[in-house]
Amino acid sequence: MTDNIFDDLPLHMPREVVQTLIQSADVRIERIVSHGHASAADFWYDQPQHEWVIVLQGAAKLQFEDGMVEMKVGDFINIPAFRKHRVDWTTPDEATVWLGVRYNAVLEEAG
């Protein structure tokens, strides 16, 4: 049986919605839906897992201590564990749908 990542997107959300699609001890795959959401001005993610994210719909800006990264559909980034970051902006007029993969293992990047 298959599911579709774009099914049942929440319409009105007071905050970003994170849904775990599948997980194991070392990997968690999530659907993240934002609709004009951003991290609080004084909040930084500083997590013990690595995180790979791709924007599937919408757009976003991620802020790091050393600069800003703009992301559009198809853009992906690998964020190493403990690299401080925050969501600075997501598209206000449509849902931004991300696929996020959090992992503990050391992986080699292709290419």
Positions of PLM-derived features:
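A generic "binding-loop/recognition-motif" signal
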Residues: 25, 48, 67, 83
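Ligand-binding loop in jelly-roll beta-barrel domains
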Residues: 82-108
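Short histidine-centered beta-strand/loop micro-motifs
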Residues: 19-21, 41-47, 64, 88-90
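Structural motif
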Residues: 59-61, 68, 84
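General beta-strand recognition
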Residues: 28, 61-63, 86, 97
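A short, N-terminal "cap"/entry segment at the start of jelly-roll beta-barrel domains
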Residues: 1-42
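Short acidic-glycine-tyrosine-enriched beta hairpin
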Residues: 66-81
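Short, conserved beta-strand element in jelly-roll/cupin
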Residues: 46-61
